Amino acid sequence: MYTMKKGKDMAKEEQETAAIEPLSPVSQLFVSPSLYCFIIFTLGFQTRCNPSTIVEGVKNTWIKLPRFSSKVEIKKNGKASWVPVSVRVEDHVVVPDLDYSNIENPDQFIEDYTSKLANTPMDMSRPLWELHLLNIKTSNAESLAIGKFHHSLGDGMSLISLLLASSRKTSDPDALPTTAATRKHASSNKKSWWLVGRFWFMIRIIFTTVVELFKYLLTLCFMRDTKTPLMGKTGDAIRSRKVIHRIVSFDDVKLVKNNMDMKVNDVLLGMTQAGLSRYLSRKYDEDMVVEKKKNLEKIRLRGTVFVNLRADTKLEDLANMMAKGSKCRWGNFVGVIIFPLWVRSEDDPLEYVRRAKSTMDIKKLSIESLICYGLIKLTRKILGGKVVETLVRRLFDHTTLTFSNVMGPDEDISFFDHPMSYVAASALGGPQALIIHYVTYVNKIVINLAVDTSVIRDPHLLCDDLVESLDIIKLAAMEKGVHKMEV
C-alpha cells in the first residue's frame, strides 16, 4: 500500500492546507495566457498495466497533496489562488478504449497520442492533472502511463519526488527509492587561507553576477538571438506542438564525463551544442545558403536554462518535501539563466564539451538565477503581474530554446507495483520553438524534444543529430583515454 502520513498528523496537515492559498510567483507566471506551461511525461512499464491498482495508489498519495486536490481560480485583478475541491480520481485517470490489434506502428501511435495530448487545452475548472493508461507494447515498454501536469503544480524536482513517493524499489518492494544528495558550494580551503580565499571568491561572484545581470538586461531590452531555422518569430503563438523522445545509454555520458573530468551536465550541454551545430550546418547546405554557413560561427544562439535553487538537491520523501522548513521545497523553486551555446563546426568534437564546461563554470560563479527569482517576486509585488509576464515573455522571445536536465532514480523502481523501464518528460509552453529536456533513469538517459512543427518540421532529424553527436564525442573521449594510458 502506498501511503504518506496517517492518523492525527495527516488530519492536522489537511486542516492546515484546506484553506485557499495564493500561487507562488513562478506558478503565477505558468498560468498566465502568454506563458501557459505544462508538463507531458511518459512512464514505460515492464509489465501490462493494471488501472485499478494505479487508481488506488493515486488515491493514497497524490490526492493527499493540496495542489492535486485544488483548482486554480484567477480573480479579476489577475491574481491566482489554489481553491480546494473534491476530487474523483477516476475522472483524472483515463483508460482509452482502443483496438490495439489494429495499431500497426505502436511507437508512432504513442508519439501521435502524446502530441495530441500536448495540443489539447487543459480544463482549468478542475485540478490540473491527468493520467492516461495504455496497454500497448512498444519497442521500449510493455505498457505506458502518459501524464499531463500543469507546471503550476511544481517543477521537475517536485514531480520526480512525487514519482519516488509513488514507487518502491524493485529489489525491495517495502523500501522507498533512494538517491544521492548533491551539496552545493562545498569548500576545501585550508584554515590559513580561508579569509583570503573567501574574499577572492566573493569578489569573483560579485563581478560575474554584475556582468551576467547586465547581459540579462540587454536581452530584456533589445538583444535578440540570430534568426535561424530553430527560432520562431517574435510574438508568434505556437501553432502545433510535437513531442518526441529517444533513449540512449547513460553509461556513454558517464564515460565522457569520467575521461574528461567533467560533470554530467557539461557533457549533455556539449552534445547539445554539437547536435545543434550539425543540424544548422545541414540546413544551410540544403538551402544552398553559402553565406549563412560561412557565418555559422557568428550566430548568437542562446538557451534559457532552468536552475534548481534548493540548497540540497536530494530527492527526499515527498512528505518531508511538503513540510515547512524542509531543505527541499515543494513547488516551483527555480531560477533561469541565459546560456550562450557554442554553435560552429569543430574538428575536435571534445571542444563542444570543453566550451560547455567553461561557460557553465562562469554561470556557477554567478547568482543571477537567485537574484532573478527574487526580482520576479519584487516586481510582481510592486508593479503587478502583467509587467512580470511581459518581461519574462521578452526573455523567451529573444532566446532560441530552453534546456534542462533532471536526474531521475538511480535504481530500478516500481510505480504502484508496475516495474518501470524508463521515464520521459517534456515541459511545453511559451513562444520558443524548441525545448530540450534530458531525464535519467538508472542506466538510461532520455532525450526529450518538444517543438513547434511550423518552425521545426523534422524533429526526428534533430534528435538523430543529438544522438550521433554523443556517439562521436564518446569515441573521441575513448581515444583521449587511450592516449592518456600510453603516456
Swiss-Prot record:
Write down the EC number.
Answer: 2.3.1.20, 2.3.1.75
Tell me where it mainly resides.
membrane
What the entry lists under Gene3D superfamilies is as follows: Chloramphenicol acetyltransferase-like domain
Specify the pathway. Answer: Glycerolipid metabolism; triacylglycerol biosynthesis; Lipid metabolism
Q: Which domain of life is it from?
A: Eukaryota
Q: Per the record, what ranges lie on the membrane's Cytoplasmic side? A: 1-193
- The gene that this protein is the product of is WSD3
Q: What is this protein called?
A: Wax ester synthase/diacylglycerol acyltransferase 3
- What family does the entry list? In the N-terminal section; belongs to the long-chain O-acyltransferase family.
Q: Which SUPFAM superfamilies match?
A: CoA-dependent acyltransferases
Q: Which residues cross the membrane?
A: 194-214
Q: Which species is this UniProt entry from?
A: Arabidopsis thaliana (Mouse-ear cress)
Q: Give the enzyme class.
A: transferase
This molecule's function is given as: Bifunctional wax ester synthase/diacylglycerol acyltransferase. Involved in cuticular wax biosynthesis.
* Subcellular location as annotated: Cell membrane; Endoplasmic reticulum membrane
Q: Name one GO molecular function term.
A: long-chain-alcohol O-fatty-acyltransferase activity
UniProt record, GO biological process: triglyceride biosynthetic process
